[in-house]
From Swiss-Prot:
Gene giving rise to this polypeptide: hspe1
GO function terms (MF aspect): ATP binding; metal ion binding; protein folding chaperone; protein-folding chaperone binding; unfolded protein binding
Disulfide bond recorded as keyword: no
Coiled-coil intervals, chain numbering: none
InterPro entries xref list: Chaperonin_GroES (IPR020818), Chaperonin_GroES_sf (IPR037124), Chaprnonin_Cpn10_CS (IPR018369), GroES-like_sf (IPR011032)
Lineage, uppermost ranks: Eukaryota, Metazoa, Chordata, Craniata, Vertebrata
Broad class of where this protein is predominantly found: mitochondrion
Keyword Mitochondrion belongs to the record: yes
GO cellular component: mitochondrial matrix; mitochondrion
Transmembrane segments: none
Protein's name in the database: 10 kDa heat shock protein, mitochondrial
Amino acid sequence: MAFRKFLPLFDRVLVERLMAETVTKGGIMLPEKSQGKVLQATVVAVGPGSMNQKGEVQPMSVKVGEKVLLPQYGGTKVVLEDKDYFLFRDADILGKYVD
């Protein structure tokens, strides 16, 4: 809950990456090198949005609690109470998962 003390500004989105799977469905343990980079995350905080040329606030495309797909590279690492979070621009998020 450390992210509750951090409020992203403008069109920034704070996410917590999901853990990589360490065991296959068949029960085989995967070494770290073969796990791959985690590209899925849960949104934990969003900024109010960015301003357009008319001075109106553009609404964010994601909400807190949604699962999103991240780009392979990018984002700013933020450490809050010994836990890693990542800060992305709203436009950098590739998509969101729908239940």
